[in-house]
Amino acid sequence: MTNIRKSHPLIKIVNHSFIDLPTPSNISAWWNFGSLLGFCLIIQIVTGLFLAMHYTSDTMTAFSSVTHICRDVNYGWLIRYMHANGASMFFICLFLHIGRGLYYGSYTYFETWNVGVILLFAVMATAFMGYVLPWGQMSFWGATVITNLLSAIPYIGTTLVEWIWGGFSVDKAPLTRFFAFHFVLPFIIAALAMIHLLFLHETGSNNPSGLISDSDKIPFHPYFSIKDLLGALILLLIFMNLVLFTPDLLGDPDNYIPANPLNTPPHIKPEWYFLFAYAILRSIPNKLGGVLALVFSILILMLFPILHMSKQRSMMFRPLSQCFFWILVADLFTLTWIGGQPVEYPFIAIGQVASILYFTIILIILPSISLLENKLLKW
């Protein structure tokens, strides 16, 4: 009788994905973030489910229902802070996962990469809608500012914004809609993650050298299952430290003030993980131009497979490309810092320089450096 894990229709899918999966023997800790993202998604779905049991999506009671969760529900404060900080951990893992993909040339797996970019958009949409739900000052004004960006679309913009608002301002209708979408999107993300894995397992994982590793593969379990478990424990340690000791570190104090349409906060800004894109948006004086730059700053990831000019896949043996990759990372940190600063000199100028540098490195410098490195290989 054959082993049940290899013959059972359902169990063999799990077996081929997590147990007998042939994995390159030299993948480093940078390959842990895929499983950590799955771990984060599970935490978010479970905590979100319990929060949804007590939350009410009505403008009159949304803020007080969150207060009620924190004060009166058993361990409600823990569930709420795990969910809020879980989003931050999700994005940290996501950015590191994308950074790994860019550095080691994983984007040459075209389908896997494009599904990944769609996943990034879905996660960003979910996080934005979730930020609106507590109905604090930043929730309300963030929703107003971001939804208002759609009015930059020619001809249909204003109609589109009023359609999303269900009226002439952000009120009960968008809050209820955002709650509905915020609830359903994580399940769509889970389905997309499965498609992401399906495409990945068609080709097998990339590895730090960027070379074909068919001749040197080992089973996923126990080698990498243990490695992933260690990664999950380290993530959990950092995560619970954040939740239990400094739960409001990454939040905005303005969100502890109930939403008031008559009182605008001095600095409207999104959560930290959107600040880089927000800085790019603010760097362009024209509204439509800013919106296009904002969208393209994420969509540009889809161009990486086309912009790859090097004969080598990974940046592991390309010191010039490495140099500009890390300049790009530093530039993203700069944009994140600028996004949280007021719109005044010198922050506007720094933001504009950083935005130009971001697009220049990706579209011009990295492909050019790759071509130069190809020449140096012959030399």
Swiss-Prot record:
Family from the record: Belongs to the cytochrome b family.
GO biological process per UniProt: mitochondrial electron transport, ubiquinol to cytochrome c
Note: Heme 1 (or BL or b562) is low-potential and absorbs at about 562 nm, and heme 2 (or BH or b566) is high-potential and absorbs at about 566 nm.
Name of the protein described by the UniProt record: Cytochrome b
One GO cellular component term: mitochondrial inner membrane
Record's function text: Component of the ubiquinol-cytochrome c reductase complex (complex III or cytochrome b-c1 complex) that is part of the mitochondrial respiratory chain. The b-c1 complex mediates electron transfer from ubiquinol to cytochrome c. Contributes to the generation of a proton gradient across the mitochondrial membrane that is then used for ATP synthesis.
Entry keyword annotation includes Nucleotide-binding: no
Binding residues for a ubiquinone: H201
UniProt keyword annotations, A-Z: Electron transport, Heme, Iron, Membrane, Metal-binding, Mitochondrion, Mitochondrion inner membrane, Respiratory chain, Transmembrane, Transmembrane helix, Transport, Ubiquinone
Binding site for heme b b566: H97, H196
Record membrane topology: Multi-pass membrane protein
Compartments where located: Mitochondrion inner membrane
Co-factor(s): heme b
Oligomer status and interactors: The cytochrome bc1 complex contains 11 subunits: 3 respiratory subunits (MT-CYB, CYC1 and UQCRFS1), 2 core proteins (UQCRC1 and UQCRC2) and 6 low-molecular weight proteins (UQCRH/QCR6, UQCRB/QCR7, UQCRQ/QCR8, UQCR10/QCR9, UQCR11/QCR10 and a cleavage product of UQCRFS1). This cytochrome bc1 complex then forms a dimer.
Bilayer-spanning residue ranges: 33-53, 77-98, 113-133, 178-198, 226-246, 288-308, 320-340, 347-367
InterPro entries, A to Z: Cyt_b/b6_C, Cyt_b/b6_C_sf, Cyt_b/b6_N, Cytb/b6-like_sf, Cytochrome_b, Cytochrome_b_C_euk/bac, Cytochrome_b_N_euk/bac, Di-haem_cyt_TM
Record text on cofactor binding: Binds 2 heme b groups non-covalently.
